């Protein structure tokens, strides 16, 4: 954090998240957090103290890939994270959110944090994670908004029976039902057009 010389009460925040999605790239998130630190260090060396306060931030559990909760870091900045929402959640291995925080040296607050009112701007460097820039022969893009996330867990209940002897007309096959739901949902998303995106990210069948 570098304090501003003329407008110390106004903060330019820069950074990114340090978690990534399952099978994500090495540069997802972490690149932006490290780049912010390097940029501020270089700017201080070249130009001295900034006019406005500049602060680097690294946020965790933004993606929701480990725990069923997204934007934990950024929600806390704006006082939108309710500790009760994560107090009893666990990852796929049974590790609790609270224990994971403790392992990193943090404790879960008892109540939502006070939202910050000093942020003047937020600057983040991030890889595209897509193909639009490359397809258009562009090396960099500037955006002022990103997609929001909605995640749903859908349970389809069918009937388990012998796969080799149950006639097709007697089956209540949830995999077949899911395949139809998946196909129709994706086709509807295509008809609605950009910037809407839709993904079925995880499918489990039992038995």
Task: List the predicted regions and their residue ranges.
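Beta-strand segments within the central parallel beta-sheet cores of soluble alpha/beta enzyme folds
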Residues: 13-15, 49-60, 195-202
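Midchain, well-structured core segments that form catalytic/ion-binding scaffolds
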Residues: 61-62, 66-207
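Acidic/His- and Gly-rich active-site-bordering loop/insert found
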Residues: 1-25, 43
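Structured catalytic/translocation cores of nucleotide/phosphate-coupled proteins
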Residues: 1-3, 12-15, 30, 152-153, ...
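Extracellular/periplasmic catalytic domains that process cell-envelope and extracellular macromolecules
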Residues: 6-7, 49-50, 116-117
């Amino acid at each position: 954090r570098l304090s501003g010389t003329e407008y110390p009460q106004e903060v330019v925040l820069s950074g990114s998240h340090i978690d990534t999605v399952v099978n994500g790239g090495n540069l997802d998130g972490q690149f932006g957090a490290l780049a912010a630190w390097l940029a501020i260090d270089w700017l201080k060396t070249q130009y001295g103290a900034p006019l406005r306060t500049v602060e680097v931030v690294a946020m965790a559990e933004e993606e929701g890939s480990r725990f069923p909760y997204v934007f934990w870091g950024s929600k806390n900045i704006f006082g939108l994270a309710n500790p009760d929402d994560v107090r009893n959640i666990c990852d796929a291995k049974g590790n609790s959110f609270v224990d994971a925080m403790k392992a990193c040296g943090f404790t879960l607050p008892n109540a939502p944090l006070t939202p910050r009112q000093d942020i003047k701007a937020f600057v983040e460097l991030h890889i595209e994670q897509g193909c639009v820039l490359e397809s258009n022969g562009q090396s960099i893009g500037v955006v002022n908004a990103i997609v929001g996330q909605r995640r749903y867990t859908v349970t389809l209940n069918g009937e388990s029976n012998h796969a080799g002897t149950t006639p097709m007309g007697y089956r209540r096959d949830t995999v077949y039902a899911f395949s139809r739901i998946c196909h129709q949902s994706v086709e509807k998303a295509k008809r609605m057009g950009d910037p809407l995106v839709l993904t079925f990210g995880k499918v489990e069948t039992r038995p």
